[in-house]
UniProtKB/Swiss-Prot annotation:
InterPro entries in UniProt: D-2-hydroxyacid_DH, D-isomer_2_OHA_DH_cat_dom, D-isomer_DH_NAD-bd, NAD(P)-bd_dom_sf
Keyword vocabulary terms for this entry: NAD, Oxidoreductase
Lineage: Bacteria, Bacillati, Bacillota, Bacilli, Bacillales
Binding site for NAD(+): 155-156, 234-236, 260, 283-286
Any single Pfam family the record assigns to this protein: 2-Hacid_dh
Cytoplasm found in the keyword field: no
Gene3D superfamilies per record: NAD(P)-binding Rossmann-like Domain
Enzyme active site: 236, 265, 283
Enzyme class, UniProt record, top EC level: oxidoreductase
Paired cysteines (S-S): none
PANTHER family: D-ISOMER SPECIFIC 2-HYDROXYACID DEHYDROGENASE FAMILY PROTEIN (AFU_ORTHOLOGUE AFUA_6G10090)
Name of the protein in its database record: Putative 2-hydroxyacid dehydrogenase SAB2178
Annotated GO MF terms: NAD binding; oxidoreductase activity, acting on the CH-OH group of donors, NAD or NADP as acceptor
Amino acid sequence: MEKVYVAGAIPEVGLKLLQEHFEVEMYEGKGLVDKDTLIKGVKNATALISLLSTNVDKDVIDAGKDLKIIANYGAGFNNIDIEYAREKSIDVTNTPKASTNATADLTIGLVLAIARRIVEGDQLSRTTGFDGWAPLFFRGREVSGKTIGIIGLGEIGSAVARRARAFDMDVLYTGPNRKEEKEREIGAKYVDLDTLLKNADFITINAAYNPKMHHLIDTEQFKMMKSTAYLINASRGPIVHEQALVQALKDNEIEGAALDVYEFEPDITDDLKSLNNVVLTPHIGNATFEARDMMSKIVANAAISAVQGEKPQFVVN
């Protein structure tokens, strides 16, 4: 029986599928798998199930001389050297569609949380308390009738747009390509990035990360935004220059931010933690039972397909 190395615990539904077809070796230590353990694990393995936090570089790929597939448990795959994997004739797959609804739900949840100061209100209620209802007390912003600007109208961005329309929001979007069919379906308008930044009340980042996207939102971009704007990032941390965001918040260039991802993840800068006009969540975009189970099945089936000589779904290289 061929071996699969699983770089961290995954939901049981996928693990059982793997156990039917492979000898399964899984990292069960505390924290993230370290490089030496990963290199040891991929030796003699036909398949590797990697997590978003698993750095699969050339050394790891070279150690996995028998690898046919690296099935990444996540929609992103910038943790893997996919070009080198291609050179070695190793398929790399991801789990794109499984994350769509969960991440879109969280994105809209972050919009509501920061606009209506939900987390801040929860903290107040649990600590000092409040004196009662008052006309000027704890005011936030309404979402209905506002403009949402979506950076990246892929599967997740489109799902965010549909949810935003249910709140009677106007939808702007930007990206490398105009998507006229989706515009008609959703009721969205394509604009360039600068126009989006200048006009949106809520700016959500739902684009995939690549080197060209690094620090797409920096000091110059914050200066374009409305002083009442909110930035929401449930995509990848390095798309936003974190220190520039901190400065924009401190200088009241924008009203607030809600983040599920961070530039130096898992580290979160103390400056962000100290600000009241920021909502922070620990990279839980697709952390639902439904999404994580589906992702588990997708990576398992991809590994099974590869060892059976079939082309797996969702190959990215």
